[in-house]
Amino acid sequence: MKIAANMKNDYYKSEIISLLLKNKDISSNRYSQTMAAMRGMKSDYYQSEILKKLIDPNVKDESEWSKLIDYAGNIHSDYYQSEVLIKIADEMPDSQSLKKQLNEAAKKIKSDYYYGEVVRETGK
């Protein structure tokens, strides 16, 4: 992950991170390491693709879900932000604190359409 963090090109950085994420035996702090490696990426598309790969049934710790929601809330594109937040809403455990955090992240979405998509998903 350290090598990927120092790369300048978003495409190659996302490819390296994606390859590393295929190895499910990565240490338990893979969320922090991956998000640190993603810092500085300008492409909302590549950020969202990596975040969606991090969202899997192996995410057990509420703090890991919280980190995913925090990062997703800072994606600039309303479309990609809503895509990631909807995937998180589908997979995350039923926790009031996580739902509240997800709704706060959704409020950063400027588009009424995409905001509504996320709110509908969290209301299920």
What are the residue ranges of the model-derived segments?
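Non-catalytic all-alpha helical scaffold/repeat segments
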Residues: 1-124
